[in-house]
């Protein structure tokens, strides 16, 4: 299969950090789960997570749970730079490490920290996806930029508005 065909079966996630969403993690997971299930029904089998706190990690965990009963499902984790996620609170770092451990593929955009690595990671995810699932409040930042880039690339976005 060519890349254009493969991306029609890949879906990526983007969203604000937990403190910006104004909804509980439980509510977020329910809504993300519904959109992941819709994506699977629509033929998406590979999911791409940028592994940031909040939406990315919650979505990755949900994909891994579904993969237990559906071996077609794959998870790709795309990190902006090496050792990303290892400086958070113990709880988030533990979840991050566990997801990475079970991912089918881990891709690192940069060897070291840079602010531009975040946008390059987001563009890589969009460039390799046929759909974006976003938890978005309308605020400026990386999520808005990712949605704008996806629209510019004619990639459909499913927006979860908390």
Which sequence ranges carry the predicted segments?
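Acidic/glycine-enriched connector segments
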Residues: 1-162
